[in-house]
Every structure is written in C-alpha cells, then in structure tokens.
C-alpha cells in the first residue's frame, strides 16, 4: 500500500542544491486534480495526464464535500491496474486540504485476530470524521518581570515553610499587571521551568500555565542557545483568546475508553502493563455522539465529515459489506471512497455470488461509480517524462519513446520502475542522459510479468 500522506512535496525538483537527498514515493508528482476555476480538467496539470472525465467527476465530489452535502455517500473508483485510482484519491485529499480528515486503508487491513473486522471498520469511520472545537478563554499573557513565592508557617507545625501564594508580574505591549496566584499554579510554573524573561500565558478558568518561549529582548544575551525567542505579546495582559482545536471522533472514543486508574497499587501496576487492543463499545460511542451533538447545538463545535478511502475493496467479505451498508445510513458518517481493479468476480465470503468489482449488488446500487481508462502511448510517454523530472533523471527522446512502447506492451508501472535502474546504468557509463542502450540493458536485467510467465511455462518441469 502506498502511504497517501507520506510525501506532500518534493523540494529537490527545483532546488539548486543538487546534493540534497529527497525521498520519492510512488505519487510524489501528484499535486491536485488539475482543474481550472470552472471545474474543467486540463490534459496535463497537477501531476495528472489524461483521465479527464474521472478528474472532473472527482472535482464535483470535492465541491460537494466542501459544501457538506456528501456525507454518508460512497464513490467507487473502478478501472484496471495502473490507471490512477490511488492517485485520484490522493488528489482529492490534497484538494480538501489538511483540515479535512482523510483516512486511507487497504481492504486487508480490516482483518485482525484481536478485534472484529466490523469494529476495525467503525474505528476508521470515526477517524474520518473531524470535530472542530472553538472555545473562548480568558488568559493572562505576557513577559515575566517578577516571580516571587511568598512563604508562610507550616499549619502542621514544625520548622518547615509552605508557599502561601505567588506574586507574578506580566508585561505586554500595552501595559503590565501583577497577579497573586494560588500555590498549585506555582507547581505548574515550576514544571514549565519558567524564569524571569520568559513569555507565558495562564488560563484564568483552569490555572493552566504554558511557557511560549523566551522574550526576544534577551536574544543577544548568549552567542549560542537552544531557546526559542518570541516577541512581546501585543495588546493587554488580560485578554480573551479564541482557541480552535481539531480532533476526530475516534480520538474522543479512545480518550473516554481508557480513563486513568486510581492511586492504589493495583491500579498503578495495571497501568504499567502494555494495554491490549480492545473494542470500543457501541454504548460509549452513543454517549460520545450525545456530547458532540450538545456541543454542536451550543455552537461550540463544528462537525467536519472527512473521507475514508478503502483500496482493494474486493478484499472485503460479505459481512463487512453488510455492516458498511448500515454504517453509511448513520447520521454521522464520512464520505467513503472505494477502489477496485476487478471486473465480474465472486464476492468474498460467498460461493456463488458473482458481482461487478467484487461488491454486492445492494451496495453497488448506492455507489457513484467513477471509471478510469487505460492510458494511450502519448499519455504514457508524458507520464514517464514527468516522472523522470521528479526523480531528476535526463532521458533522451528515443529512450522515452522506447519506454513508452514498453509501457503500452507490458504495464505503466514496469516502465516507471525501469527509470531508476536506467539512471544507474547511465551513470556507470559516465553519461548524464539515459539512452536506448541503457533501456535495453535494464530490460534484459529485469523481467516484466509477461516475459516471466512465458519463462515459467517453458520451464514448468524444472521449477
């Protein structure tokens, strides 16, 4: 499986530093769907070549997701191998941006010994649903100018002293303020290792202390220092601050499913043991949903339906498909994008149910199907040329034509995978450009699937 979120950009393509080493993944060249303002796909744009209808259909889906009119629906990307199904799913995630949850997985990931497959599916469903919580907090923010703990006699007697309160002076761009804080807040200040000259903020309601960094007025104090310097906070010391936090429903489920234990010895020993992966009950999820609904009604939170991408959907069995039907009808559901490279095939878990793409007929009826078409020779040549640019390889025109022909006769993946070996062979011959001889030599060294099959057929008695 290609990790969809692994490489978002390749700064080495246009970088002047030729010595920089950048990792190139299978879909590094994909930057988006490549649509104009009216939603029409350009032939070569955003890392895509061709697939005009499929890209325009995905563009409509992206608009529906942004308008929040697509939740609880499902799309099927259907097409042969090497036709860009995973690339389309990656492009959808990039068009939606980082704030919209995107959860990719392969059909075989749902099978586990410890947890039911339907439970794993529901976990990924909840991972693909985001919750944006907006909270207005009263905070005191500024540079620490005074930090004085006040001692008092120990009420229990003896010679020891206790902290009765703490005097903290804070300075901002518009004034200063002196605060008298509780001793428990002083413990938080000590944990954050706050000293005079640090910029901190203190939440008025909870008393939580956060050290932001060192004031930039002290930047010239040392020649070398590991501190992060921040400017003096603007405005008054006492202010109202809006804090936005993005979480998923699965995060809330896990937080409530694993409460902290008590202080007794048995509870502490239990926390030391490695927790086994367990199922989250439906009752707990319903309670979380009630709290989420309450926050939404109060205007504190906003629900963000994301995208759940399931590749190789033909690997799912009839039980998961039945559960998927039910999950799609839920009032809290993400957009589900499925991908399959199979035609008419038997549904897994059945003996005689043959259905398109390995998906049962009742689920097929719910899907919007987007078809991806095989690439022609010119499109394969353009893809190989762009891929060579991403991998910083120079290929002469005749070698590109030969690779395009091989991609047409065998597969696009085989032609793309030959690029790196061809580059090594060209370097071995002290050439900066890949030529036809390099391609032919790499072809002899590495077999494609068709030639490998022929060899096995002729040597069946030997192997």
UniProtKB/Swiss-Prot annotation:
Misc note: Present with 11600 molecules/cell in log phase SD medium.
Family listed: Belongs to the RuvB family.
Gene3D superfamilies, per database record: 1.10.8.60, P-loop containing nucleotide triphosphate hydrolases (3.40.50.300), RuvB-like helicase, domain II (2.40.50.360)
A GO MF label: 5'-3' DNA helicase activity
UniProt xrefs under PANTHER family: RUVB-RELATED REPTIN AND PONTIN
Positions bearing N-acetylvaline: 2
Disulfide links within the chain: none
Catalytic activity, as annotated: ATP + H2O = ADP + phosphate + H(+)
EC number of the protein: 3.6.4.12
Compartment(s) of residence: Nucleus
GO CC terms in record: chromatin; Ino80 complex; NuA4 histone acetyltransferase complex; nucleus; R2TP complex; Swr1 complex; TTT Hsp90 cochaperone complex
Gene Ontology BP annotations: box C/D snoRNP assembly; chromatin remodeling; DNA repair; protein stabilization; regulation of DNA-templated transcription; regulation of transcription by RNA polymerase II
Assembly information from the UniProt record: Probably forms a homohexamer. Interacts with RVB2 and may form heterododecamers with RVB2. Component of the SWR1 chromatin remodeling complex composed of at least ACT1, ARP4, RVB1, RVB2, ARP6, YAF9, VPS71, VPS72, SWC3, SWC4, SWC5, SWC7 and SWR1, and perhaps BDF1. Component of the chromatin-remodeling INO80 complex, at least composed of ARP4, ARP5, ARP8, RVB1, RVB2, TAF14, NHP10, IES1, IES3, IES4, IES6, ACT1, IES2, IES5 and INO80. Component of the R2TP complex composed of at least RVB1, RVB2, TAH1 and PIH1. Interacts with SPT15/TBP and HSP90.
Enzyme class: hydrolase
UniProt keyword Cell wall biogenesis/degradation present: no
Binding-site residues, ATP: 79-86
Function of the molecule: DNA helicase which participates in several chromatin remodeling complexes, including the SWR1 and the INO80 complexes. The SWR1 complex mediates the ATP-dependent exchange of histone H2A for the H2A variant HZT1 leading to transcriptional regulation of selected genes by chromatin remodeling. The INO80 complex remodels chromatin by shifting nucleosomes. Its ability to induce transcription of some phosphate-responsive genes is modulated by inositol polyphosphates. The INO80 complex is involved in DNA repair by associating to 'Ser-129' phosphorylated H2A histones as a response to DNA damage.
Chief place of localization: nucleus
UniProt region (Disordered), positions on chain: 1-20
InterPro entries assigned: AAA+_ATPase, P-loop_NTPase, RuvB-like, RuvB-like_C, RuvBL1/2_DNA/RNA_bd_dom, TIP49_P-loop
Source species of the chain: Saccharomyces cerevisiae (strain ATCC 204508 / S288c) (Baker's yeast)
Listed name of the protein: RuvB-like protein 1
């Amino acid at each position: 499986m290609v990790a969809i979120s692994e490489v978002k950009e390749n700064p080495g393509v246009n970088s002047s530093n030729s010595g920089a080493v950048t990792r190139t993944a299978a879909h590094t060249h994909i930057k988006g769907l490549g649509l104009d303002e009216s939603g029409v796909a350009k032939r070569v744009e955003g890392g895509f070549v061709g697939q005009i209808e499929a890209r325009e259909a995905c563009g409509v889906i992206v608009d529906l997701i942004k308008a929040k009119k697509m939740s609880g629906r499902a799309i099927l990307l259907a097409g042969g191998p090497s036709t860009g199904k995973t690339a389309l799913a990656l492009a959808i995630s990039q068009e939606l941006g980082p704030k919209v949850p995107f959860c990719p997985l392969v059909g075989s990931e749902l099978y586990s010994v410890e947890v039911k497959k339907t439970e794993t599916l529901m976990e990924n469903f909840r991972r693909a649903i985001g919750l944006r919580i907006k909270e207005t907090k009263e905070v005191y923010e500024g540079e620490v100018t005074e930090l004085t703990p006040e001692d008092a006699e120990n009420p229990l007697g003896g010679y020891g002293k206790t902290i009765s309160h703490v005097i903290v002076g804070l300075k901002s761009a518009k004034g200063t303020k002196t605060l008298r804080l509780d001793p428990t807040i002083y413990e938080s200040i000590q944990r954050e290792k706050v000293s005079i000259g640090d910029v901190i903020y203190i939440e008025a309601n909870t008393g939580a202390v956060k050290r932001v960094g060192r004031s930039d007025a002290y930047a010239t104090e040392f020649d070398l220092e590991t501190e992060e310097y921040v400017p003096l906070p603007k405005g008054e010391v006492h202010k109202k601050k809006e804090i936005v936090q993005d979480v998923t429903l699965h995060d809330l489920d896990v937080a409530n499913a694993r409460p902290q234990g008590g202080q007794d010895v048995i509870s502490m020993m239990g926390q030391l043991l490695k927790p086994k992966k367990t199922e989250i009950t439906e009752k707990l999820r319903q309670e979380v949903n009630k709290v989420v609904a309450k926050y939404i009604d109060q205007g504190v939170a906003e629900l963000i339906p994301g995208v759940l991408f399931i590749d190789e959907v033909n690997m799912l069995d009839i039980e998961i498909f039945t559960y998927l039907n039910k999950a799609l009808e839920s009032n809290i559901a993400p957009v589900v994008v499925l991908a399959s490279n199979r035609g008419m095939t038997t549904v897994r878990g059945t003996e005689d149910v043959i259905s398109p793409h390995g998906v049962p007929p009742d689920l097929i009826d719910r899907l919007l199907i987007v078809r991806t078409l095989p690439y022609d020779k010119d499109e394969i040549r353009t893809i190989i040329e762009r891929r060579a640019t991403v991998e910083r390889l120079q290929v002469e025109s005749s070698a590109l034509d030969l690779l395009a022909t091989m991609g047409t006769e065998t597969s696009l993946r085989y032609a793309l995978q030959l690029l790196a070996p061809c580059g090594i062979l060209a370097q071995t011959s002290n050439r900066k450009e890949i030529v036809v001889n390099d391609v032919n030599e790499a072809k002899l060294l590495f077999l494609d699937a068709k030639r490998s099959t022929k060899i096995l057929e002729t040597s069946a008695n030997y192997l």
